[in-house]
Amino acid sequence: MTTSNKKIRWGVLGYARIAREAVIPAILRSSNSVFHAIASREPSKLDECRQKYNCPKTFQSYEELLRDPEIDAIYIPLPNALHREWTIKAAEHGKHVLCEKPIGLNAAECREMIAASKQHGVTLMEAFMYRYSDNTRKVIEVLRSGALGEIKFIYSAFRFLLGNPGSIKFKPELGGGSLYDVGCYPLNFTGMVVDEIARIQAVATGKPVAPAPMPDSASTSWMKRICRMDWRSRTRS
C-alpha cells in the first residue's frame, strides 16, 4: 500500500461464525477496507458467503488465497492450534495479519510468529476488539490516574453457555478449552492495566468440564499483585 487513501483488500481464511457474523460485516461497513476473498474447504460455505456477502473471490485452498497478489491483509479465525502455521505462511506471502485470539498456544509460538512478521515486513495483530473501545480506555484512564489507589488484587469471571458439545472449543488437540478461549481476555486486560510484570505464577484447579477434561479455574500471581480468574464453560443439560 503506497497511498494513505488506498483501501485494504482483505482475505479471510475460514468461514467461522465470528468471521461471518462479526468481522466480514465490519469490513463491509468500513470506509477503508474491501472484502476481497474467502477460503474454505467446504464448498457449501463458499456458496453461502458468495450469496450473502457478494464475495468477489472464493477459494477451497488457503494456500491459493495467500498467493492472490491483490490481497493486502489476512484475517485468521481458524482453530487456535492452526494460528501459528497460517500466520507464518501469510507473512511469507507478504500479507499483513489480523489473527483471532489467542494468537498462539504458548510463548514459543508467539515468538515465531512475531519473528516471521518482522522478517517479511508485515504487521501482525491479535484480535482483541475491546482494547479499542471507549469503555476500556476510560477504565484504564481511571486506574492509571490513581483515583482508586494502588491495584492489589484483580478478580475476573468470564462465563457463557456453550450449547454445542461438538464444538472445537472442547477439543484440546485444536487448542480448545475455556482457558484458551476466554481466559486470554482477563489475562490480556490485566496486562493492559498493570504496567509492571516481574514474575508470573499460575495454578489451575477444578473438576473436568464435560465433554472434555479441561481445567475450569486458575490463579495467577504477579509480583506485588494477584490476579484471580475463573473460566468456566458448560453445555446444556
Region roles according to the model:
Residues 7, 33-35, 55, 71, ...:
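Core-facing hydrophobic residues within beta-strands of well-ordered domains
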